[in-house]
Amino acid sequence: MSLQRFLFFALVVFCLISCSSAKKAQHSEVSFEDGIPQIKHLVVIYMENHSFDNLYGEFKGANGLDNARKGNFIQVNKEGEPYQYLPEIPRNSSFPTNLPNKLFNIDQYVTSDKATPDVTHRFFHNQLQIDSGKMDKFAAYNDSKGLAMGYYSTKKLPLYPIAKEYTLCDNFFQSGFGGSYFNHVYLISATAAVWPDAPKSMVANLDADGNLIKDGAITPDGYAVNTVISRNKPYPPQSDTSKLLPPQTMPTIGDRMSEKGVSWAWYSEGWDDAVAGRENNFAYNHEPFLYFAQYKEGTEGRKNLKDQNDFIKAAKEGTLPAVCFVKPGGGNDEHPGGSAVYPSEQGAVKLINDVLNGPNGKDALVILTYDEFGGFFDHVVPPKIDRWGPGSRIPAILIGPFAKKGYIDSTPYETVSILSFIEHRWGLEPLAERDKNANPFKNALIFK
């Protein structure tokens, strides 16, 4: 054997050993149960309204657009007939009127530094869009029509380098069907809010087979599933208080943490301005603890509701509580219609860096995820658990020294996996069956 040939084979063997070692390095040296106490701080950054395919469909190695195209998810109208072209996108003349009936790149028409129209993301509509797993009515049951089939260039996203460096979950689902309000409440309580005597005008009407006749915020049996605002202050000026949700009394993860002496806070952009009655970008339906009696004005629990500026200060000073929920405000949260993807993600990157570069970064886990899919297509059929969901697949990124590096985690997770993690880490009782049974990111984390 020539020296050149010998060196070639030696290099191949070295590469194989190195790759094998890298794979082994992805396994914890200690168990999840023994290692999880190493995490002293959890930071959940809760962005808005994008499906996995919409943002990370082009992520190499993930279950994305290549598989979606193989599935040939032709969109059909409400009668089940295929569209010749995607239905015309309203409220924005940048999109052509004859888009082919398939997935398309949004960036070629509206760059990611500009907001697109909002896309329909409601409780009953999400189920109609999924269409019993056919995934073929996202355009039909959508006010923005064909826009539902759009996606962004993944590598151009500000969060892409972070997703590539750490763990990207490509099998993570929003816990509840539909929109932001419902999934925010579910994130902290693993249950649906109740309003048995809601105004009739707010109640949805379904036929005997469960088909939607008239949409509404409240189910016929009294659960609040679409956007409502809390009767607890602050609420928007000139609100009709008869149409504001009465304070809820079921337990939340905040209650569990406070009972156990675990420090925590929910930080919202614009909170201080909203409380003071000043002009603000605070989103009233994105403040889930505000829906509960335990957090109304004058309560002890209210002290845990803070402004995003307080989070930034605490992150830089190293005074973060054990558990932080961080909620960017309108214009900065990626919500279509009011926020653009690119600058919103730039803001999220700054929040992440504030944590990782601060004194608490060495023992922190950051989870960046989205409340829901925003009405955008995703090709993966959600698992069936109960009447509430899960809904569509959404992105989730685990970041920090305990997240596996350069890893795609295809383990089934959902929004309340975050609750499950908190409960496992700090020894808390589950709130409901859903969080009790959810995987607490066991396969995404690594401990030494």
Question: In which residue ranges do the predicted regions lie?
Answer:
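C-terminal motif of bacterial Sec signal peptides marking the signal peptidase cleavage site
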Residues: 17-18
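Sec-dependent N-terminal signal peptides
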Residues: 6-14
